[in-house]
């Protein structure tokens, strides 16, 4: 299978540890005792890498890593057999705390400052990919670099002949379309925000997804949470019906969908199969505490129904 370099040039920058704390109720100003906790290597790019690995697709995680927290991330990926090509930075990789009580609260770390030498090192890694690679960029860039840095990084990949997948929001997503990404995946709310419209029917969603296609994307998936997902290609539009279940992990679900679609598309070039695997990965992660296991993904894949509109 084609090796995928799964790199998220910013959420890759923002490699993180997700520290998940479970507690009945948080009493502010009091000593609270957690019932259970989990620590995962996190960040959008890492999530993509971990799902690709479960699907048996060779990939390399890249980005910035630092400190004892960075070692935890690298060790976690090593344990899953994922290859890494990280740039070392001076400050610690951030920790994001997710408190799951009667309500869910997040406290996100700031993440390291990236200097010019470190950025140049990442640029060298991205410039060295081969024409049959796909590079996944995801999320917002570190604050000291800003999202404009993508306009510098994505062309480095495209000049090698490699494809890019761009999992961005808003203006950053629009700016990326000039590089003809293999896939972009805004959800319906992000699509509304981009065009400043209200989407009432599937036909509206398709109309604006086609506008994104016209601006340069090769495939556009609009995920609609409990209402399924729409894939728009130059040839056709496909709708994947929603699958019912209890949502536990909405954050990793989108990243899992990106991994499932990209991995299958690179293998088979079949957009319908790619959509099915994307929906299977996204849905099964949504119904899991951590990212979905391959067993659960395969089980969910058998429930995915796709119709051509």
What are these regions (language model features)?
Residues 49-58, 263-268:
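Alpha-helix C-terminal capping segments
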Residues 1-9, 13:
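Single conserved hydrophobic/aromatic residue that forms the stacking wall/gate
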Residues 120-123, 146-154, 200-206, 240-243:
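Charged helix-capping and loop-helix junction motifs
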């Amino acid at each position: 299978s084609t090796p995928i370099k799964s790199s998220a040039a910013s959420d890759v920058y923002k490699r993180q540890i997700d520290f998940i704390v479970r507690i009945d109720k948080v009493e502010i100003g009091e000593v609270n005792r957690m019932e259970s906790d989990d620590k995962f290597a996190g960040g959008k790019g890492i999530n993509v890498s971990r799902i690709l690995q479960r699907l048996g697709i060779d990939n390399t995680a890249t980005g910035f890593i630092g400190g004892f927290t960075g070692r935890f991330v690298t060790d976690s990926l090593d344990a899953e057999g994922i290859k890494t090509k990280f740039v070392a930075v001076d400050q610690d990789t951030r920790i994001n705390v997710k408190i799951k009580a009667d309500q869910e609260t997040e406290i996100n770390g700031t993440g390291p400052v990236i200097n010019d030498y470190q950025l140049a090192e990442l640029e060298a890694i991205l410039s060295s990919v081969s024409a049959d690679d796909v590079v996944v960029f995801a999320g917002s860039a570190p604050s000291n670099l800003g999202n404009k840095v993508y306009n510098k990084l994505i062309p480095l990949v495209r000049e090698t002949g490699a494809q890019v997948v761009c999992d961005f929001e808003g203006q950053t997503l629009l700016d990326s379309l000039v590089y003809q990404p293999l896939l972009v995946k805004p959800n319906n709310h992000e699509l509304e925000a981009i065009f400043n419209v209200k989407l009432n029917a599937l036909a509206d969603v398709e109309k604006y997804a086609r506008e994104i296609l016209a601006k340069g994307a090769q495939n556009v998936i609009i995920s609609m949470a409990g209402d399924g997902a729409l894939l728009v290609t130059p040839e056709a539009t496909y709708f994947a019906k929603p699958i019912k279940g209890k949502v536990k992990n909405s954050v990793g679900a989108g990243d899992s969908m990106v991994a499932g679609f990209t991995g299958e598309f690179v293998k088979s070039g079949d957009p319908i199969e790619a959509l099915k695997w994307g929906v299977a990965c996204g849905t099964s992660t949504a119904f899991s505490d951590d990212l979905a296991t391959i067993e659960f993904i395969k089980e969910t894949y058998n429930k995915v129904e796709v119709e051509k509109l």
